[in-house]
Amino acid sequence: MPEKATLSLGNASFRPGSSVAYVPVTLDRPTPNTVIARIITVNGSGTYRALSGYNYQTVDTVVIFRPGDPLIQTVAVPIIAATEGQQFQLKLREAPWGGLQGQSTATITASSAVEATLKATGTFREPRTFAATGTLQFELRKDTHKRSPDGGWDRWATSLANGRTQVANGETGLYLDSSIFPGIEGPVYWGTDGLVLHTQKLKTPISYGGQTWYYGSSALDGRNFLATQIGYGQYEWEAKMPNRRGSWPAFWLVSTSGWPPEIDIYEGFGYQSFWDFDRHVAHTIHVGANSTRYDARGVTIQTQQAYGLSGYSQGFHRFAVDIQRDYITWFVDGVETYQSVNPFQGFRFYPIMDVAVKTNGTYDDGSGDMTVKSFKIYSAP
């Protein structure tokens, strides 16, 4: 993978009496993937401090660089009234998503002695809108849906390639199948709104693989399901996500030749206390070979602020990826949310949809279920 770009804020000046100050945000190199920075204004300090609401208007914004974009943008800060020497700051809320962090704070000063910082010019690419450009190869349907413990050429597996446990990930859930573990709540079933992947705290613990399991996870894995496998094209799910703390829902792709490569289309880190089920999404690629990962590139995005998208556990939303020879592009509700150069030319992938469990708690708040209303695969040459 090409090196990540480093994002920095630059100091800026504006003339007293101006109505706006422009603050540069720069990358040190062309970026191989989308870089997103959340930026806020901060009051100045000392005798010449400028204050929000008196001297300038508060700014809380997002700056997005996509592959191919110019290396400099500017943030516009409205000025109310500022006298010579007054200053305030612009700062990053956190390290930029998808890039490295350079200078994280910039000082903006009212000065008639230096040239005012100019607004950046350049042509920035508009975000793509999802479009199925391939040929429909597979569609999830109740009347043709089949599954079995290990799957087959025409059906899903209810296990993962390395079995029914993911101890190395710290998972505490056992991937269940009613045909193997009778008497449990069904881990996969068709509900009113679609296919449900159900997770649970087991009423009766299960002994499996030399360990006692207290939680049940759910998965559908296409490693042997030929119709779900493509090299280039699009995968699109429409789903409602769980919101139970400790749940770990995901839509992801794994190479048919073995892990890695891996493409995470949607991942929800519900076992992390910071995770907001309705506003956060994660997109990642895992690079490597022969069961060894040597790089992972991706982002966790607060999509409400970045793109105006939210409510993933409250209703149904679309999560998609477009795999082309040059780029991999992610979408939520048809809006491009992330893009990366494609390091996986020539690979074929199979899909996995799952809800893992990673908790030792009561696991009884909210819903631990993912409901999939639609899933389509489009193949492209």
Report the location of each language-model feature:
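GH16 jelly-roll
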Residues: 71, 114-381
